[in-house]
From Swiss-Prot:
Pfam families: 60KD_IMP, YidC_periplas. Gene3D superfamilies: 2.70.98.90. It comes from Aromatoleum aromaticum (strain DSM 19018 / LMG 30748 / EbN1). The gene is yidC. GO terms for cellular component: plasma membrane. Belongs to the OXA1/ALB3/YidC family. Type 1 subfamily. The keyword Ubl conjugation does not apply. This is Membrane protein insertase YidC. The keyword Protein transport applies. One of its GO terms (molecular function) is membrane insertase activity. NCBIfam families: PRK01318.1-3 (NF002352), PRK01318.1-4 (NF002353), yidC_nterm (TIGR03593), yidC_oxa1_cterm (TIGR03592). One of its GO terms (biological process) is protein insertion into membrane. It comes from the Bacteria.
Amino acid sequence: MDQRRLVLFLVFSLSLVMLWNAWLKQSQPAPTAVTATAGVEGAGVPTPTTGVAPGATTAVPGVPGAATASTAPRMVVRTDLMVAEVSAQGGDIVRLELAQHKATADKTKNFVLFDDGTIHLYAAQSGLIGEDLPTHKTTFALPQGEQVLKEGEDRLVVRLEAPEQDGVKVTKVMTFHRGNYLVDVAYEIVNSSERTLSPHAYYQLTRDGKPAESVEAFGVTTFTGPAFYTDAEKFQKVQFEEIAEGKAKFVKKASDGWIAMVQHYFVSAWLPQGGTEREFFAQKVGNDLYSAGVIVPVAAIQPGQSGRVEASLYAGPQEQDKLEDIAPGLDLVVDYGWLTVIAAPLFWVLSWIHGVVGNWGWAIIIVTILIKLMFFPLSAASYKSMAKMRVLGPRMQRLKELYGNDKAKMQQEMMEMYRKEKINPLGGCLPILVQIPVFISLYWVLLGSVEMRQAPWLGWIQDLSAKDPYFILPVIMGVSMLIQMKLNPTPPDPIQAKVMMAMPVIFTFMFLWFPSGLVLYWVVNNILSIAQQWQITRMIESEKSGAKPA
């Protein structure tokens, strides 16, 4: 029994080591500034496989002296949730700050999602495909001054004018909403020429291949890259390496769906209107620069007529209760790793409790109590087994003295003693075995849920997704583990006994770097386990106190 218990502890320790390594990587300093020589303007204009009008071209005409995205004039748009910088080149959103989410390294600054090269290259681009139609490389005329969503207004409409070409006038209309991370992007096309227009619209996300944060656990990296969704194929993630090697597998054509760029905690996604055929693409467009997007057809526009095409851009946090309402399957961008089947309902319960108590730390404590109650019968049986083993300690010591040189005989006598006393030798291992998947699932919930990011509990714990700044919880956890060890029967093998006593020290050291929310769960779980085990041990020892050893 002791050997099996030791093996389980070692397996659990290995799990903790892997989680610890993952958290150390996640906690590394932010990446250094991008040194790429080309910006997002290096992304090309995509080409639809069908439907381009005869004589139309997707080539972008050269514009002498045209400004790049980094040097073109910009317009700042402010809402209650975001600060966006829109470039005159293409009307692209080349920088986006999220006002309700602070930077990891400096909490006095807003988190930057789209970036123009300070740390990353990342932009939302769009345009039209067809002869002389504006693309993301066309210079638009911007409104004068900063555009601000004023008090009492629910939306802010910004109009960008493209140069008229051969009787075709195009206006890019961007609509920002109060309390929403959605931006509606429409193209209004007025055809004053003598030809029929059959254009396509494209919407793409262009970014470098560097992960926003390096996170790895159990061989699974927190995903950074494009993701496609359709009703037919559902959610498909594509690695940047697969795009570079031309091996990316995803749905190419569909009548529904969206394209997203996923990273830790945040996501951007182009959401075309439903019911129209569309083509998806992903390509490498520069040195460590990738573009993924969608192409949709625009209904033919006769001479003297006008047309309009629209898509929505979501750029914000992976708030699970809101994503599924925005678009089908958008909530799948939240990455819980290979234990999603446990982690997803665990987060749902946490979220519901948080809605009642208003604090994620207290929600974790309540969930821990509920989990403990759920496994109470199993834990009780296990602790009874360990308590009986503790009572039988003197008899086991005598067996060791009698048969110490005959391992087989000693094992035989011990098993006979277990049988007579109705003790399950594996009973003490079950609580540890059961908690491993729950422990790992909670780790992924804390790691992958933006709701936990920078969420305070009380006092010194101001971010449940970060380590305890003063290591108070890990020390309490280590002490609680030591108390638990004292309640367990002492292994007859001195080496095993020393290894078991070293576990609290080893675990405490590793837990120093774990998210404080996870340590909080483990501390509360240990305290509840100690109370339950102490009560059961006291009861068993009282029952056996008058019995004579066999």
